[in-house]
Design a protein with these regions (language model features):
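Radical SAM enzyme [4Fe-4S]-AdoMet core and its adjacent flexible, acidic
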Residues: 1, 136, 141-143, 147-258
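Conserved alpha-helical substructure of the radical SAM core
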Residues: 2-128, 132-136
């Protein structure tokens, strides 16, 4: 493939079932918006150090506005009419939208394949809703293996306890769960415990070390969040380099070819 040629996502999704892969290929060929993401709200009950989306309620109007339930439902209908099948519902924390239940019921009745992206801490409050209108899958952010790590990373109380309760509820409902973790300095030492939690619950897990700068003035202290690579031992590096340059088994003339 030439550098100028665009490769659609469907051709990079080797993991897709052949039927769904064919659907995505057809959608690409016919310019159908087969999938989409609805960021319902920048509200969140967590205050994660590295978040570039969350805004407190008094800041929302400074950066635009929060769409109403009716507006989201109208957009969803337009997306459906255009051919959208897969939807990711996210935030902020999407369950914090004042009309979340109304939006969710309407979207599920439209027939979308919905993935809910959430911190899981509020899921148990909507147990009846998700029993009646279950998502196709849930992608959950997991920031630690105990409440203390959540206190350090998300600056909330009982964060892990609530998230774990939400995860257990979804598993009891047989709803597929995928965990995603952003690793920063404040939870780096807990990664092994997170892995043990993932293995114990037999869940898929995607770790991530990328911390992004917000484009709308959200205060994120990158210097004290990003994981720094370990410093190299310059003496050891020089010694290794010297050994690679001088090999007693090589003939002197061969060095001219390097």
């Amino acid at each position: 493939m030439s550098e100028q040629q665009f490769e659609p996502a469907c051709r990079r999704m080797e993991w897709l079932d052949p039927f769904y892969k064919a659907v995505w290929e057809k959608a690409y060929a016919d310019a159908i918006p087969i999938s989409g993401t609805f960021e319902l709200t920048p509200r969140c009950n967590f205050n994660c150090r590295m978040c570039y989306v969350h805004l407190p309620e008094n800041e929302i109007k400074k950066h635009g506005t929060e769409l109403t339930g009716a507006e989201w439902i109208r957009i969803a209908q337009e997306a459906k009419d255009a051919g959208t099948t897969w939807l990711c519902i996210t935030g902020g924390e999407p369950l914090m939208h004042p009309e979340f239940e109304t939006i969710w019921r309407e979207l599920t009745q439209m027939g979308f394949f919905i993935t809910l992206q959430t911190n899981a801490s509020l899921l148990t409050e909507y147990e009846k809703l998700f029993e009646e209108c279950p998502p196709r899958a849930c992608k959950i952010t997991l920031y630690g293996s105990n409440d203390q790590v959540y206190r350090d990373v998300c600056r909330v109380e009982n964060g892990f306890t609530k998230a774990d309760a939400g995860i257990r509820m979804l598993r009891q409902m047989k709803i597929p769960v995928e965990l995603v973790s952003t690793v920063i300095q404040q939870n780096l030492d807990d990664v092994e415990n997170i892995i043990r939690y993932v293995e114990k619950n037999k869940l898929r897990w995607i770790p991530n070390i990328n911390v992004r700068t917000a484009g709308r003035g959200v205060d994120v202290d990158m210097e004290h969040l990003r994981i720094r690579p370990p410093k190299k031992d310059s003496n050891a590096e020089q010694e290794s380099s010297r050994k690679n340059l001088v090999d007693p088994e090589r003939k002197p003339c061969t060095y001219c070819k390097d």
